[in-house]
Regions:
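N-terminal, active-site-proximal structural segment of metallo-dependent hydrolase catalytic domains
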Residues: 20-115, 119-131, 201
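Active-site metal-binding loops of divalent metal-dependent hydrolases
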Residues: 38, 96, 183, 225-226
Length: 264
């Protein structure tokens, strides 16, 4: 699903992010958010109880510290480039192995000058890949975060990645909720694997609906790799995500918009 998950952009948003469409009012806060599937960010050491053997020095990929360092540097350069003159305020990452690779990325790559902090999931995924969120503390004050486990369609089904829910404050003191998701892949066929993605989408939808009940004016962004297109059931029917209009007056509160819909 390379067409989808190599694109580093915001995939979903809810009003009132009108400022992203070009008009700024006195209370508007402009900041950049990036979603990026880094594709197998593994270090070269074995992570106990995880199936990461493909990314060890003696495996078929001959993965080693030098290759790992180069990948970190490449990821850092991409993130910096997306920010223009300033690094993005928030960066959602998919397919990161563990805390170790996140520490290396934030402290020992070109990102170290950006002073990012991060939170991530610790999912039961057998390969050990997770999702994470980088944030700049001067732009986003972390209040809380949690992992949301995704149900399995059958008891013997393979576990998948948790969904990351992060809550924080922007500079204008608005509460901001970020959900980072990496839906199950299409391995084995799109139709055969679809039930897994539908369950993940329902988990996200439940989390969003819950935020509607506790926030008067929820400001929610959903980021990640959904392994589906805008017209697929997980996006169109479960999440009910629509293509955004270029006219800000037509955007509705408590409505989910897919920023890539109609752009393929």
């Amino acid at each position: 699903m390379n067409v989808i998950h190599k694109i580093g952009v915001i995939l979903f948003l809810l009003c009132p992010y009108i400022s992203l469409y070009g008009q700024e009012g006195k209370d508007t806060l402009m900041f950049r958010i990036v979603s990026y599937n880094v594709e197998n960010l593994f270090d070269s050491r074995h992570d106990t109880l995880k199936n990461d053997y493909e990314f060890l020095p003696d495996a078929t990929r001959h993965w080693n510290y030098s290759k790992y360092r180069k990948k970190l540097d490449n990821i850092a350069r991409v993130i910096i480039a997306t920010g223009g003159w300033t690094p993005p305020a928030l960066v959602a990452l998919c397919e990161v192995e563990n805390d170790s690779v996140m520490r290396d990325l934030t402290r020992y790559s070109a990102l170290r000058e950006a002073d990012y902090r991060y939170v991530m999931t610790q999912s039961p995924d057998k390969r050990g890949i997770d999702v994470a969120l980088l944030y700049q503390r001067n732009l986003f004050k972390l209040l809380s975060y949690q992992s949301l486990p995704v149900d399995k369609p059958r008891k013997n089904s393979r576990p998948t990645r948790d969904i990351l829910h992060v809550n924080g404050l922007l500079l204008n003191r608005d509460t901001h909720d970020v959900l980072v998701a990496h839906f199950p892949s299409r391995s084995g066929g799109a139709r055969e694997s679809e039930p897994y993605r539908l369950l993940a989408a329902r988990k996200v939808k439940h989390a969003i609906d819950s935020l509607y009940t506790i926030r008067r004016h929820p400001q929610i962004v959903l980021l990640g790799d959904f392994n589906d297109y805008p017209e697929n059931k997980s996006v169109k029917e479960v999440l009910e995500a629509a293509a955004p209009s270029t006219l800000q007056d037509s955007l509705r509160p408590q409505k989910l918009y897919h920023l890539l819909a109609g752009k393929a």
